[in-house]
Amino acid sequence: MAFSSCLKFYPFSISQAVTLTHHSFSLNLTPPSSTISFASPHSAALSSTDVKLLDSLRSQPDDSAALRLFNLASKKPNFSPEPALYEEILLRLGRSGSFDDMKKILEDMKSSRCEMGTSTFLILIESYAQFELQDEILSVVDWMIDEFGLKPDTHFYNRMLNLLVDGNSLKLVEISHAKMSVWGIKPDVSTFNVLIKALCRAHQLRPAILMLEDMPSYGLVPDEKTFTTVMQGYIEEGDLDGALRIREQMVEFGCSWSNVSVNVIVHGFCKEGRVEDALNFIQEMSNQDGFFPDQYTFNTLVNGLCKAGHVKHAIEIMDVMLQEGYDPDVYTYNSVISGLCKLGEVKEAVEVLDQMITRDCSPNTVTYNTLISTLCKENQVEEATELARVLTSKGILPDVCTFNSLIQGLCLTRNHRVAMELFEEMRSKGCEPDEFTYNMLIDSLCSKGKLDEALNMLKQMELSGCARSVITYNTLIDGFCKANKTREAEEIFDEMEVHGVSRNSVTYNTLIDGLCKSRRVEDAAQLMDQMIMEGQKPDKYTYNSLLTHFCRGGDIKKAADIVQAMTSNGCEPDIVTYGTLISGLCKAGRVEVASKLLRSIQMKGINLTPHAYNPVIQGLFRKRKTTEAINLFREMLEQNEAPPDAVSYRIVFRGLCNGGGPIREAVDFLVELLEKGFVPEFSSLYMLAEGLLTLSMEETLVKLVNMVMQKARFSEEEVSMVKGLLKIRKFQDALATLGGVLDSRQPRRTYRSR
């Protein structure tokens, strides 16, 4: 018979959802047990012989021993065991996945004419499900029907469906539903509930609602589980309003509410950060239906408050929890620790860990991983390592997340040697590195210029069976390009296609930028053409790389053509684009054009940055247009979005010291520069000092030198040395000493465009 008339118009089809990630709707906070257990349906009294054999089977150390004992007993004359004995050995074999032996036992039961029912076959299909072999389940049912003459009943069918849904075998659920009428199964409320759960997991809420609404036509009334499943489906889809509408239907049906139903709605509110609404809902249900929060309710509230950043309120809920006789569990503490870590309050998070242990609540891997990851991000790698040792001492084995956090922390603090040692330790302990592990180490090696070692790490990655990703290749290409080894970078680029790894815009942009910096601009242009042919659209990073090359080479015409092409292809130039073009114009001595472009950008409503201002200010100083340069700098000061940076101040100071204005103006500007927290370039400071000495303004020079030493945080010994030389009027020696210390304070840096 047809399962549901509504399915003529809304067929039960979840084929599009077969590959969906499993989303558990279970309210359990603890993971399900890995062992399965079944209660024997055969409760008839066993003979004393069978009781002894049953006890012996249960006492065997392993499943093989149990099977040997059973086979030995079966060879005795007149061996005719009760079904309970067969089911016991089936259970033992099922736990170890001995499916062939299980089938042989079932055939023995048939040949010995032992009483058999569908419940016996449930043991076999549940064992398959335990080992994630759901594909075998339907063939077992066909075997049961064809070879044993047993037809599945509603209970068997519901249990089978549930196993398929829980194993995310949604396509098999669809097939099973199609066979329902063939098997002559009459659905009950549980059947509908399981099928509705399958539809919700497949994100097909509309058919799930239609199925719920069609239940009365079968003389069935939706129960609490029916409504709760649909509400959970809506919440998983991020549609709390839809869940609340189902709640109203539930009330109209007169369906009673349990803590499970209430907790689903509480979870929905908290998931959306609406913790206050969750509390109001709890109050409403308490007044109407006598609801009282349970462990799950409290945990949901604590988690919701922590995710919203209200950790103090979460701790208050924990206090209420204790008052009501509920001990916070590992889930509660993990929520609070995670919330504190997100707020950067690591010390407080560690205190909560100590409190957790004091209250006999054992931390788990999640607890430690949260703290270790946060400590590493805060550059407290030693503390994180110590915590990992504590974790191990408590018998909790570090997992891949633990190792990855520590390795990442070590790489970020440039402690690559220890990171590699930890990587080797990770493998020796049987914890397989993942893609993230390898990518971090490859990135660290590339940043240190150890490119051969990075390639060796790539080989190790392949040998371990870990899939290379586009991130892996992009990291290597970037490393080789920065080392000016573009030929090798191109080889890695070509290798991606061989290994079936798709290139993305970052891949192309990285190599194009590397080629441009190596002055292989024609190759870069060809690569951009290839990028377009492969369906990748050039973006601002692509164009900016080419633009930078032409601007540095003084080819303003080609630079302008790049900007024109960029606009024509629907890629709007940004401030980096314009800033680069302005810099190129200024280097070519076309400061007036650059100034006009600056104003044009301003008119477009684009916020100007020092990247755009600085080249024009520098160009104006070079043309001895000091007043215009200073006015432009002052204009920058008024821009709250992007005030002058250290480079801006140094350009102006250099311009003033280089004869660009009265010496008093240069002195005043140096004071302003120091007050902003910047330290001047020594070359500019030296020019100013020479000017002051020429004008016999030694006292002013001494004051300025003292201010510079204070801002640059000279040691007492360094200050004493410079002051001593100034006191005996050895100004050149004092300036030389000052310059030497400043150079050590401000080592020359190489800036790489990103």
Curated annotation (Swiss-Prot):
Function of the protein: May be involved in female gametophyte development.
Q: Where are the PPR repeats?
A: 82-116, 117-152, 153-187, 188-222, 223-257, 258-288, 294-328, 329-363, 364-398, 399-433, 434-468, 469-503, 504-538, 539-573, 574-608, 609-643, 645-680
**What family is it from?**
Belongs to the PPR family. P subfamily.
Q: What is this protein called?
A: Pentatricopeptide repeat-containing protein At3g53700, chloroplastic
The protein's matches in PROSITE patterns, at most eight in alphabetical order, are given as: PPR
Kindly list the places in or outside the cell where this protein is found, as annotated in its UniProt entry.
Answer: Plastid, Chloroplast
Q: Which UniProt keywords apply?
A: Chloroplast, Plastid, Repeat, Transit peptide
Its GO CC terms are: chloroplast
Q: Which Gene3D superfamilies match?
A: Tetratricopeptide repeat domain (1.25.40.10)
One molecular function GO term is: mRNA binding
From which source organism is this entry?
A: Arabidopsis thaliana
Query: One Pfam match, by short name?
Result: PPR_2
The residue span given for the transit peptide is 1-72
Spell out the InterPro entries in the cross-references.
Mito_RNA-Proc/Resp, Pentatricopeptide_rpt, TPR-like_helical_dom_sf
Q: Which domain of life is it from?
A: Eukaryota
Q: Name one GO biological process term.
A: embryo development ending in seed dormancy
Span-the-membrane segments of this chain are none
